[in-house]
Each structure stands twice: as structure tokens, then as C-alpha cells.
């Protein structure tokens, strides 16, 4: 059971303060009866909630695919810079949204935004081996020695350990490489390539597990994930 105002806020319908006004005006009907108090507790999954004549399609959690642009922070909020949450359309906004994992400010591509902490933890935990696929553009040709270094795992001078990566493809010009990692440490892909002898000049995330970025999404755009797409993240055949 949850408070009605919390339910409406979580679904992006209105703020809790606005919910109080809606209730006072008789605009909210629950199971056929007007609810006058916004702190009334109901079961949102078993109740019919109608706001101004429109039935609420309740979703316990929301999962959003975004094509993150460069220059935007992977954070819920920031006083000085634009964040991925700022880019979420009003129709998807609700309390508790956060990016499931981080991309560097200048990294683009697949970002998953949700309010489901358990699913995000499952996706990000290294023990679950959910691989993330990136396309890296380099300032030097990619060599067999670099491939061997990356696929063997790396230990930096400061003691940071990176698990072995998987090289999926290399462009004919040898300067664009698709690489998979199952971790998400700070600047990991850039640091791994730098250790192997090349600097990353551009980085884009293409996939998480078996879920690939919808290429029809322009940078800054987003859409909801289907249940099937959500399951692809954890498809063992892709991890």
C-alpha cells in the first residue's frame, strides 16, 4: 500500500503538492470513488486510478534507452552542468530516476535510465559478467600486440586491475576498434588503450549485454525499453 500522492509523483503525473489540489477538487477517482485526501493509501497494482477522466497506466518501474550525447554528465543532478536526467522528456520523468552506470562526459551512446535499483545493480555488478560493447577511435593503428595486451588483462602501476577485454572487430584502417568489457571502472576503456599504446580520441557505447543501441535514436533522444529488450541485457548468450 502506498500514499496516493507518492504514486502520482512516481508516475510523473504531478508533484505531491499538486496531488493534494487535485484530490481537493475531486479530480481523482479510485475504484469508482472520489478520493479527497492525497495521503490515502491504496494498492496501485490492484486499483483503478482515474485523473481528470484519464485512467492511469501504472508502471512499477521505468526503463529508458537514451542515445547520450557528448558534453552531458551521467548523473541524476548537478548544479553546474547538464545531466542525462535533464534530457529525459517530461512524459517519462518521475521521482528517483538515475543513470544505470556512467559514461564519461565526452563518451556517447547507449545509456539506460531507470528507477529500479535492483535491476541496475544486477546489470552493473562485475560478478554477473554483463559485457558492454564500445567503439573506440584511436590516434594510432591497432596492433596484434595491443590486442594481446587487452585480452590478457591489465594491471596499472597504481595497482588497478582490469579483467581481460574482448576485441570484437578492427576497422580496415586499424584505428577503429570494437571492444567489450564486463566492468565499468573510471575511464576504463581509455586507460586500457593508453596502457597498450594508443589514445582514444572518440568513444561510443553500442551495447549492454545483448541490448544494442537503437540507431534510429538521434543523440539526446530516448524511448522506453520493452520487456523483451530489458531481458536482452541479461541474456547469457550475449555475455
Regions found by a protein language model. Name each.
Residues 1-239:
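Basic, flexible Lys/Arg- and Gly-enriched helix-loop patches that mediate nucleic-acid binding at interfaces
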Amino acid at each position: 500500500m502506498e500514499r496516493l500522492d507518492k504514486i502520482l509523483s512516481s508516475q510523473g503525473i504531478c508533484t505531491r503538492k499538486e496531488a493534494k489540489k487535485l484530490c481537493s477538487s475531486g479530480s481523482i477517482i479510485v475504484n469508482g470513488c472520489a478520493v479527497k485526501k492525497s495521503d490515502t493509501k491504496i494498492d496501485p497494482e490492484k486499483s483503478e486510478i482515474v485523473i481528470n477522466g484519464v485512467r492511469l497506466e501504472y508502471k512499477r518501474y521505468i526503463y529508458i534507452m537514451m542515445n547520450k550525447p557528448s558534453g552531458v554528465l551521467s548523473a541524476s543532478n548537478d548544479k553546474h552542468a547538464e545531466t542525462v536526467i535533464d534530457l529525459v522528456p517530461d512524459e517519462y520523468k518521475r521521482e528517483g530516476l538515475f543513470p544505470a552506470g556512467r559514461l564519461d562526459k565526452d563518451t556517447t551512446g547507449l545509456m539506460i535510465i531507470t528507477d529500479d535499483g535492483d535491476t541496475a545493480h544486477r546489470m552493473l555488478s562485475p560478478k554477473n559478467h554483463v559485457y558492454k560493447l564500445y567503439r573506440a577511435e584511436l590516434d594510432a593503428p591497432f596492433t596484434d600486440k595491443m590486442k594481446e595486451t587487452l585480452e590478457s588483462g591489465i594491471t596499472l602501476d597504481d595497482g588497478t586491475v582490469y579483467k581481460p577485454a574482448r576485441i570484437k572487430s578492427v576497422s580496415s584502417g586499424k584505428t577503429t576498434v570494437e571492444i567489450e568489457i564486463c566492468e565499468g571502472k573510471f575511464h576504463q576503456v581509455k586507460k586500457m588503450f593508453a596502457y597498450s599504446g594508443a589514445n582514444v580520441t572518440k568513444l561510443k557505447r553500442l551495447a549492454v549485454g545483448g541490448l544494442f543501441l537503437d540507431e534510429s535514436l538521434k543523440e539526446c533522444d530516448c524511448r522506453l525499453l520493452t520487456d523483451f529488450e530489458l531481458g536482452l541485457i541479461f541474456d547469457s548468450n550475449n555475455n
